[in-house]
Amino acid sequence: MESPSAPPHRWCIPWQRLLLTASLLTFWNPPTTAKLTIESTPFNVAEGKEVLLLVHNLPQHLFGYSWYKGERVDGNRQIIGYVIGTQQATPGPAYSGREIIYPNASLLIQNIIQNDTGFYTLHVIKSDLVNEEATGQFRVYPELPKPSISSNNSKPVEDKDAVAFTCEPETQDATYLWWVNNQSLPVSPRLQLSNGNRTLTLFNVTRNDTASYKCETQNPVSARRSDSVILNVLYGPDAPTISPLNTSYRSGENLNLSCHAASNPPAQYSWFVNGTFQQSTQELFIPNITVNNSGSYTCQAHNSDTGLNRTTVTTITVYAEPPKPFITSNNSNPVEDEDAVALTCEPEIQNTTYLWWVNNQSLPVSPRLQLSNDNRTLTLLSVTRNDVGPYECGIQNELSVDHSDPVILNVLYGPDDPTISPSYTYYRPGVNLSLSCHAASNPPAQYSWLIDGNIQQHTQELFISNITEKNSGLYTCQANNSASGHSRTTVKTITVSAELPKPSISSNNSKPVEDKDAVAFTCEPEAQNTTYLWWVNGQSLPVSPRLQLSNGNRTLTLFNVTRNDARAYVCGIQNSVSANRSDPVTLDVLYGPDTPIISPPDSSYLSGANLNLSCHSASNPSPQYSWRINGIPQQHTQVLFIAKITPNNNGTYACFVSNLATGRNNSIVKSITVSASGTSPGLSAGATVGIMIGVLVGVALI
């Protein structure tokens, strides 16, 4: 409250503070028409504080005024009276010594108590002895103490108990509020407020209800919060978890198992092996385990406060260290395409998985590879040289895979047809002849040379120096494999001549189809130190992406041949002493049939005339022809002749062509109109001249 600007009466009521600001003076001389009112400042007052009953619109020319406790003027309830003329204040029966009256009639009450609550009446006496009254009021509230929370259950059990929190103390005219983790109460069917919100009940408490709870009390003059209360919910134990999750161990390892179960208070643990109690610890340690330590391991968790027990069982398997595997074979030297081989993974062990690898890869899918029921034996049927391996087998248990050393299969094969090099067959006198023979074989082949059927030597190479024309002949290389018992020979014709022979042209395709086939011409023979040349129609080869030379220009390839490639091809060979050309070879390109042409072009005729139609289509070989009139087969000729035609011969005339060599067909349709004698054979809408061209693929020629 602010101090007044005008002093109270002189009698012994000390000034304690100013209650009215300078603006209050404006109310001392209000207009006489305004109604007298009292304003309580503040309206809600805390115990021990003060309140000012502020007078508004006080009338002029007053004799005095008095304050009363209550809503009416009662001498027994007078607090104080004031005479303006003498400026004297007189206390009444209800005066407590805490009241101060001011010349403007306002009343200050200090050190407010609960009994001060209520109405106060100001009685004003004017100079003309006319009275006027006004009533004001205020309410007194206590200053709230700091609340606290009490609980009916300090250790509730999860999913079983309910907890009732009560905000203390119980205070009249107070509002109660609750917070959980400093947040307003969540909406939940398990939370219930009662007793004017003073009691918070949690039904079927869970571990998630373990939170910070606070209550608050409020009234119009104060608000206080309690200290936090943490709810201690007893729960568990949950189903224990045994770690690590590994259930397979090698013999000789240490077994170290740990058990954990969510629980409040923390659980007590016990271990059982195959149903036999071991120890009451959270961890179980067994050093240097053996196969005998295999079994079921049970962890039991117990909560003495909740009275609950939970168990978890894990099965531990201890494996003996397996030996390193190795591979045995029933045939150490199998013959290609004759023998089968059975590879067996040793040793035989129970409860073991057998695995196989070939060339460090898993076994390919092949009808020639067969595994036994237990996968321990791998059988290769009709072995080939590609089956040499290496092969590995493995034995696998829950812990590891052990590999054998690799085994290489020694497949006996060959000899294949020998190859004689170099490939030259033509030599000049005076040079050295050096021939080498090679045949794929295991073990390596033994070689022999024969000339014109006569044994020369048992070596892989044949060398003859300073050859003459007498050295011309048949040179045979014979390869022998004593292990497989097989022999193979290759014969090569060697010609020794000072002059180059007349070359010839060979072809890989004597009748290529246009726009489909490629043709490779090769100039024969292959001769040492020889240059090969080509001509087409007596001219050097044109530049074309469809023409390609290879094999030292000895081979000429024509890609996607066309009918224009049907020319005369000549090859030539030359060396330092001679040159020669082949006879020309004409390429026979099969093509067509193209779209046929019907002649003459006339389509209108007079009745009585002869109709003579001829059909022609470019094709190699020449095509076969057939005719149809209005879709009806007629004859298989190139020319269609009808004497003395009539209007009945009107219609569509189709010529079909077919090339059996290329497998292609084609056709053309022509409309023929025959007019009666004496009429003009002009073109009408019904006799429009037109040629409808189309390829009728798959139409059978009749």
Swiss-Prot record:
Changing residue 69 to A: Abolishes dimerization. It comes from the Eukaryota. SMART domains: IG (SM00409), IGc2 (SM00408). One of its GO terms (molecular function) is protein homodimerization activity. The keyword Glycoprotein applies. It is found in: Cell membrane; Apical cell membrane; Cell surface. Glycans are attached at residues 104, 115, 152, 182, 197, 204, 208, 246, 256, 274, 288, 292, 309, 330, 351, 360, 375, 432, 466, 480, 508, 529, 553, 560, 580, 612, 650, 665. Complex immunoreactive glycoprotein with a MW of 180 kDa comprising 60% carbohydrate. Changing residue 66 to N: Abolishes dimerization. Disulfide bonds join 167-215, 259-299, 345-393, 437-477, 523-571, 615-655. Keywords: Apoptosis, Cell adhesion, Cell membrane, Disulfide bond, Glycoprotein, GPI-anchor, Immunoglobulin domain, Lipoprotein, Membrane, Oncogene, Repeat, Signal. Expressed in columnar epithelial and goblet cells of the colon (at protein level). Found in adenocarcinomas of endodermally derived digestive system epithelium and fetal colon. Residues 35-144 form the Ig-like V-type domain. Pfam families: Ig_2, Ig_3, V-set. InterPro entries: CEA_cell_adhesion, Ig-like_dom, Ig-like_dom_sf, Ig-like_fold, Ig_sub, Ig_sub2, Ig_V-set. Changing residue 63 to I: No effect on dimerization. Reduced affinity for E.coli Dr adhesins. Residues 1-34 form the signal peptide. It is a lipid-anchor; GPI-anchor. Changing residue 74 to A: No effect on dimerization. Residues 686-702 form a propeptide. Cell surface glycoprotein that plays a role in cell adhesion, intracellular signaling and tumor progression. Mediates homophilic and heterophilic cell adhesion with other carcinoembryonic antigen-related cell adhesion molecules, such as CEACAM6. Plays a role as an oncogene by promoting tumor progression; induces resistance to anoikis of colorectal carcinoma cells. Homodimer. Belongs to the immunoglobulin superfamily. CEA family. This is Cell adhesion molecule CEACAM5. The gene is CEACAM5.
